[in-house]
Amino acid sequence: MAIYHLEAKVVSREKGRSAVAASAYLSCSKILNDYDGVQHDYTRKKGLVWQEVFLPENAPTERQDRSVLWNAVEESEKTKDSRLAREFVVVLPIELNKSEWQKLLTEFIQEQFVSDGMCADVSIHDPHPPGHNPHAHIMLTVRPLDEQGKWQYKTEKKYLCVRNGEEKGFTATEFKTAQVDGWEKQ
């Protein structure tokens, strides 16, 4: 019988973490962090079963490379306490095989995150002994991408407005234009 476990974390500079370092560790790879010049080499780490980077359609293709993706994230965040990424650890059912894990994760990530403009870096680990503790690490960008492939704001206020009895929500930027068209905040 499958056992459910989900853990959610935030990768932030305030805690002394780096999105580049986290990605290198989870993908058992070697990545140079352009932000601080530190080379993160986890190529000797064992237990990696599968890894994949998922991008929305509007993402620049070079971000398929996790080094480019996470260095772009590090560059876009300016403060010493920046939230760089969200990380989820999900236990995988031992009753499923590797291809079923991949299919399950791919569908979940596409539907829940990538469809909303988020970039996802996924790794499946099955440490020794194999089949004992299969789990996936899902790293997500904190900022989604807009239609032009640029980082959006982390959180954006929506203003509920009314015009002639009709209600509609606008972001702060959209509201400036909507005011000209007669929309008013409620």
Task: Show the residue positions of the predicted features.
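N-terminal nicking endonuclease/strand-transfer module with a His-rich metal-binding environment
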Residues: 1-186
